[in-house]
Amino acid sequence: SVEQIVELPVVATIIEDHLVKGAIDILDVRFGSLWTSITREEFYKLEPEFGDRFEVTIYHADMLVYQNQVVYGKSFADVRIGQPILYINSLYRLGLAINQGSFAKAYNVGVGSSWTIEIKKIEG
């Protein structure tokens, strides 16, 4: 029997000019990839092309945890070993990973509504 049901807050995706904000929902523990709440359709509002660079910023509460330029790729082969990559995962959500590494371990990133991610298209 269930004694109590706890509702968890859902972080809504915010779409602004050249920027999408969401939450880090899942850590793929086998590979250390981050799976975000940002859907493929939401990310496509930025009109990404494979090979485009994005400024990726991760916050835990209000603390900056990670900020770097990351390539949007079709597969991990699109970046060198040890480099970060943005990709669409099997759930049609935006993922962030390190080729042959653990993004979660490298930057001590967790999951939940207090972990947010911003993806900003770099023009040019």
Kindly give the residue locations of the regions a language model identified.
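A structural detector for beta-sheet-dominated domains
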Residues: 27, 37, 59, 118-120
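Short acidic/glycine-rich loops and adjacent helix/strand connectors
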Residues: 12, 51-52, 58, 121-123
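Anionic-ligand-binding alpha/beta catalytic cores of soluble enzymes and soluble regulatory domains
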Residues: 1-50
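Short small/polar-residue motifs
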Residues: 19-25, 80-85, 115
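Conserved glycine-rich phosphate/nucleotide-binding loop
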Residues: 105-124
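Generic hydrophobic/packing signal
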Residues: 3, 92, 103, 113-115
